[in-house]
Amino acid sequence: MSLPHSIRLAAGSGPTFGVDDLACAAATHLGCWEDEGLAVTWTPALGGIAAMKKVLAGEVDAAYGGLGPVLQLRAAGEKLRIVASMARALAQNLVVQPHIADTGQLRDSSWAVDGIGALSHHMARCIVSSLGLDEERIDWRVVGPPPERIARLLAGEVDASLIRVEEALALTNDPANDLKMLLGFAELKQLVAVQPHGVLVTTEAFERINPEVLSKLARGIITASRRLRDDFDGFVQTYEYYVSVSLPAADIERIWAQECASEGFAINGELTPDHWQRQIASFAALNPHLPSVTREAVIADQFVREALADLGRRAGPDRGPAG
């Protein structure tokens, strides 16, 4: 069936999706965007910075990636705009080599990240800052999305890396290696209360010319987030189709329950002023050398507001107002 509207999206997660970006997968797999009359084609990108560069180069119309690259590029003068959040936090765990016994031993360690400024690097910097460690003593190794980071861990080439929750479970439960989980989901949530997360991003030019397409994009991602939150079967269906890591059913249900309990699903599109002022303040504290970015400049909240006016606001921390 030919749909009346189409959009090209870059995926900063590369060729795979995980729990931390499952809303994008669900919007495609569960037909949420199709129900809006929107045909979506995905282009893999090796990290959020690469995804945003594809948007700026005109190779795609919009992208999914971490909020850090968006703020970084916006500070540099690039006219990027956030259309909606696809999560409210980062569903990853910190996996380390066996010689790392505690967080103090992360000092002088090597970390595998997807890119400088990208999501795993942004969150890693938040962790290092919260632990009171000197970031200058961390050896950041740019290797790419989770599969590449896992490969470096298994090869013993790096000391630590943030890995998707499902991949971390499978990895640390595998007797074939001696990697361990130093900080799990709940511990990271306590350590870093304001966590960077994924967003859908476009350019000011595309926003100006294609408002109807972006309205459909926002409605679809909100609907997908709600279906993941409300329907465990839909979560499992999307997980099993897109996520390459096989886990026992009990572990998948535990991950879903964890996401629900932590209110990680962006069931109202999470563009609320308080959330974003805290995100921008956290980013500015990590990057004091960059020009300041305002919420009004970087966020196109009209599409989420329109979607919520039609779909209704759900109870939750991102209930609003969104603008």
Name these PLM-found stretches.
Residues 48, 103, 146-147, 232, ...:
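Residues at or immediately preceding the N-termini of alpha-helices
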Residues 148, 158-244:
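Pocket-lining segment of extracytoplasmic ligand-binding domains
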Residues 150-153:
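Rossmann-fold dinucleotide-binding core
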Residues 2-136, 140-143, 155-165, 178-185:
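Short, glycine-/small- and polar/acidic-enriched structural segments
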Residues 14, 85, 190-191, 271-272:
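Short Gly/Pro-enriched turn/cap motifs at secondary-structure boundaries
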Residues 25, 71-74, 125, 169, ...:
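Predominant activation on well-ordered alpha-helical scaffold segments within soluble catalytic domains
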Residues 280-323:
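Conserved C-terminal helix/tail region of periplasmic/extracytoplasmic solute-binding proteins
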Residues 209-290:
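Secondary-structure end/capping motifs
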